[in-house]
Amino acid sequence: MTMFKTTFRQTATIAVSLISLLVSPMLWANTNNTIEEQLSTLEKYSQGRLGVALINTEDNSQITYRGEERFAMASTSKVMAVAAVLKESEKQAGLLDKNITIKKSDLVAYSPITEKHLVTGMSLAQLSAATLQYSDNTAMNKILDYLGGPAKVTQFARSINDVTYRLDRKEPELNTAIHGDPRDTTSPIAMAKSLQALTLGDALGQSQRQQLVTWLKGNTTGDHSIKAGLPKHWIVGDKTGSGDYGTTNDIAVIWPKNHAPLILVVYFTQQEQDAKYRKDIIVKATEIVTKEISNSPQTK
């Protein structure tokens, strides 16, 4: 019995040491390593596939990791769908006030807002807010129905010079995130450039752009994702996403103190279909790519 206890204790010590060796590289963000090396270490630790794109609008410099590779968007795809509605509202006064009927048969999994409006219906503005701020899946589907289907969102993406984004399915099917499946995917850098164009550029009219930014700033699902990896006084507008294979995503517009805005996209997926979500990886990737700016005296 004594021998077993000693052996168990030694084994446990060795196990803890090995875990420390694996975990500590993720926690230290060694300044002697390049950002790419730090992200690579994080990816190896996570045993998944990580995609990152950061655009610093102060000088338009970029940091990317697997930036050109395709990743399942999951609910981050919703930003483009809502933007497509906003674009149409530029030509149709009062469009956002248009009431959309919601039937019980329309409801799909995770619809915390739309399920409360089966009698009254919701305006396109309300559906857009529910889509972005609560990731309501039925709201997304009603927006897609109004636009004419997922292909219309892809068409809108092309109109703002995004040749990578593609939306093929509705909720919840768009979240299957099967490895190698190009459906409902984009690349981190393509999404970052589109998010920049939509929120800071001229892809939308001024009032539509301001509305999109307001909705993103009011997101309720992002407190433990990109936002958690940033100084608390920075302003963030984001859209999270999750799906099969532990797909864990977040895309954000970030306003650091005394600094031009940042655009950050972090996509992450894993090998097992039922893998757990890893918001900790999103947080750590955020810390790595924004460390230089967050440590600057002017942004503190």
Curated annotation (Swiss-Prot):
Monomer. It catalyses: a beta-lactam + H2O = a substituted beta-amino acid. Its EC number is 3.5.2.6. Changing residue 23 to A: In strain: 5E78-1. Residues 1-29 form the signal peptide. It comes from Proteus vulgaris. Changing residue 283 to A: In strain: 5E78-1. This is Beta-lactamase. GO terms for biological process: beta-lactam antibiotic catabolic process; response to antibiotic.
